[in-house]
């Protein structure tokens, strides 16, 4: 019994001394920072060009209107025409006459913002920044006529587009 008592005391002292001999390891202090974004939001406002005529709409490089994207926390936007004939054309949006099915004119999108890239693909235009950051909160996009707009009549023209946004 006495041997067991000494054995227990010896084991206890040995455990305590090995713990007290342990050296402290390295310590690190690190600042953790993050950015909390506003909820993603997207709106678009169309402003057609005044005083369009058959002669200036029928030629290329005529400004027909400006679509201004107002957004928060958006990285890229895809603008696609819902016109079936535009799905095979790179970045084209066709405006069709409201009552005359054979009258239409094609446009493409452009911008004056040097920090914006427009990737014109079959059926859509991808709008993104050159450095991968978020789009500016207000981004005007110009709709410019293309070549081959020959069968025009006076009246109202419309184009339907789908705007899809991407967030990270």
Swiss-Prot record:
Record-annotated disulphide pairs: none
PTM info: A longer minor form, starting at amino acid 15, has been detected by amino acid sequencing. This is probably due to alternative processing of the signal peptide.
Subcellular location(s) of the protein: Fimbrium
Source species, domain of life: Bacteria
Signal found in the keyword field: yes
TM annotation in the entry: none
Secretion signal, residue range per the UniProt entry: 1-22
Keywords: Fimbrium, Signal
A GO CC term assigned to this protein in UniProt: pilus
Main localization, broad class: other
Functional note: Fimbriae (also called pili), polar filaments radiating from the surface of the bacterium to a length of 0.5-1.5 micrometers and numbering 100-300 per cell, enable bacteria to colonize the epithelium of specific host organs.
Protein name as catalogued: CS3 fimbrial subunit A
